[in-house]
């Protein structure tokens, strides 16, 4: 008998202070890759009040104005209103950058070095990464995080278009879905907190967002008289963004991935070039898992990788289909090894990652986005046929 339970996931909009920092970090990364595809970038950002600090390690031939890129990132989010202390044109920017450590560089470069196990390009660090896919939604993502992102994306559209003039950039969404086994059947609760101007009343915020946002995004058949709507439950959200909370790059890793339903290795994505397996191997894991599900070989699939710094081969690769596999799991794992290559250099090549594509990934999830498959290559299902053939 299938078990009924509720699973919740949250998302944040691009105006959330942590996402402001993720956006800045990925703007800096793309600025490097635009001029030098072989740039090595690890860029962190902190935002508080009307101050932004960027720091990290960059080895690149790219030349650009860091401060201008920071302001451009903030402007794209929409922090240009006079009623917000944090502002693209007036914020103070502090930059503290150095080059990548020579010790790390020799491990990652495609060269021989004393004490290095191989001359091939190695992983940029040790660590473990996960990829996940399931058949709950057309984009093969878990329903709670998928709809939390869709609410956030539409909320931002309503703000930027001017359709709801009292909206401001900072917001969070949370969706609780009731399941019967692995099948989502109804929405138990929607939580939405959005920054707003001081002159709008709570009653208008609640009514507007339920009618114009939630009911237009969530499947009507999943909403019922028992669905709970918690809209700005503190009663006021005027102070937001970095004015209200300090933001730091890399603090929304569960929002960025699978909303807690698929596991996470702990490494953040934003501000890191693809030699960092925290990012590139996580993208690879999604590509593998999505193609397994798209091929009909499982209803759910999770892939785990582990790497050692400077080493070209993964230490381990494992596959779990949660008892939903249509073929023997050992056979599936062999097929995955035959179809995909997990060396860091090959991941970069297969997914075409040495391009300035990363600011497209920053907000509303790095996975489940099918609006730009040319950039987000890990969302393609172009290996499903090869996998089916490999297990035949």
Where are these regions (language model features)?
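N-terminal, positively charged regions that mediate nucleic acid binding
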Residues: 1-42, 48, 379
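A short glycine-rich, hydrophobically flanked beta-strand micro-motif that places a catalytic Asp/Glu
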Residues: 39-43, 171-177, 227-231, 297-308
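Short, charge-patterned binding micro-sites
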Residues: 41-60, 309-313
């Amino acid at each position: 008998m299938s078990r009924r339970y509720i699973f919740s996931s949250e998302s944040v909009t691009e105006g959330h202070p942590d996402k402001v920092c993720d956006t800045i970090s990925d703007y800096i990364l793309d600025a490097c890759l635009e001029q030098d595809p072989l740039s090595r970038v690890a860029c962190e950002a902190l935002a508080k009040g009307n101050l932004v600090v960027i720091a990290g390690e960059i080895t690149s031939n790219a030349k650009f104005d860091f401060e201008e890129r920071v302001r451009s990132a903030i402007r794209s989010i929409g922090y240009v209103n006079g009623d917000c202390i944090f502002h693209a044109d007036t914020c103070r920017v502090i930059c503290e950058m150095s080059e990548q450590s020579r010790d790390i560089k020799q491990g990652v470069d495609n060269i021989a070095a004393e004490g290095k196990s191989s001359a091939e390009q190695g992983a940029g660090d040790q660590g473990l990464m996960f990829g996940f896919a399931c058949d709950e939604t057309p984009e093969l993502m878990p329903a709670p995080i998928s709809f939390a992102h869709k609410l956030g994306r539409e909320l931002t559209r309503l703000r930027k278009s001017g359709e709801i003039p009292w909206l401001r950039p900072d917001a969070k969404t949370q969706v609780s879905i009731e399941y019967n086994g692995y099948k989502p059947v109804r929405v138990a609760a929607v939580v939405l907190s959005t920054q707003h101007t001081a002159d709008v009343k709570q009653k208008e915020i609640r009514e507007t967002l339920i009618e114009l946002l939630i009911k237009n995004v969530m499947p009507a058949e999943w909403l019922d008289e028992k669905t709970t709507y918690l809209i700005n439950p503190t009663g006021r959200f005027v102070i937001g963004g970095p004015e209200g909370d300090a933001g730091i790059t890399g603090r929304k890793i569960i929002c960025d991935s699978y909303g807690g339903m698929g596991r996470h290795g702990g490494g953040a994505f934003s501000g890191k070039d693809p030699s960092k397996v925290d990012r590139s191997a996580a993208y690879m894991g999604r590509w593998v898992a999505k193609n397994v599900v798209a091929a009909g070989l499982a209803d759910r699939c999770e892939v785990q990788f582990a790497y050692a710094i400077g080493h070209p081969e993964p230490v381990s690769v494992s596959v779990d289909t949660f008892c939903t596999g249509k073929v023997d799991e050992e056979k599936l794992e062999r097929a995955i090894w035959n179809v995909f290559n997990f060396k860091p250099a090959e991941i970069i090549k297969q997914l075409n990652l040495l391009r300035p594509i990363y600011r497209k990934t920053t907000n509303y999830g790095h996975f489940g986005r099918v609006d730009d498959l040319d950039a987000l290559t890990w969302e393609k299902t172009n290996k499903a046929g090869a996998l089916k053939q490999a297990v035949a």
